[in-house]
Amino acid sequence: MNGFLMDTNHVIAWEARNPALIAKLEALPKNDLVYACAITLGEIAAGHEMTSGDLVRRHQVEQFLNLYVLPKEIAITLYTRSYYGQIMGRLWRRTPPAKPSVSTDSHLVNTLGVNVNDVWIVACAWEHGLILLTTDSMTNIRNVTPEVTFENWLV
C-alpha cells in the first residue's frame, strides 16, 4: 500500500487547515493516499468526550472526519496485533524493568514514556507499509521500529 498514515496531531492540523500540511497534501501525486487508523479516530472521539467544549466546533470536526478521514480509515486487524506484539517485545527486551514485578503498562508509561496508543498506530503503519505522519517524538518506539518511516509535515 502506498501512502501515509496520519497520527492524531496531523488529522487535527488537517482539519484546522495548517498551511504547511495543506501544501504537502496538495503536492502529493494522485496515487499517494493519506489514511488514519481507528486508534487515531478513537483518540479524537475521546478528546470530544473528555472536554465540555464547544458543540458547534465538535460538530464541525465530526463533519470533516466523515467527509475526508473516515472513508480512508484503516481498521485494527488480527494482523495488526502481530506488529503490535513485535514492537512491545522489542521495547521490553531493549529496556526491561528493574524489578520483575513491575507491570507492563507501568513500565511503558512511567519508565519509557511510551503511549500504548502510539504503539498501535505505529503497528498499523508498519503493517500497511505507510509513512507515519506525527509530531510526537516516540523516541523509544522509533528506536525499535526501523521498518517504519516517521515524518513531521507540520514544520
Would you name each region that the model predicts?
Residues H10-V11, T40, T80, W120-I121, ...:
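Alpha-helix capping/helix-boundary segments
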Residues E43, Y83, N143:
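Phosphate- and divalent-cation-binding pockets in alpha/beta enzyme and binding domains
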Residues M1-L65, W92:
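Short, well-structured N-terminal submotif of metal-dependent ribonuclease cores
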Residues L70-T77, T149-V155:
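Short acidic-hydrophobic, aromatic-tinged amphipathic segments that line or gate anion-handling sites
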Residues N31, L67-P71, H128:
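Structured helix-beta-strand junction loops
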Residues V122-V155:
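Acidic, PIN/NYN-like endoribonuclease modules and their adjacent C-terminal/linker elements
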Residues N18, G47-E49, I87, V144-E147:
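Short aromatic-enriched loop/helix-cap "lid" or pocket-rim segments at secondary-structure transitions
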Residues A46, K72-T135:
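Active-site neighborhoods of divalent-metal-dependent phosphate/nucleic-acid chemistry enzymes
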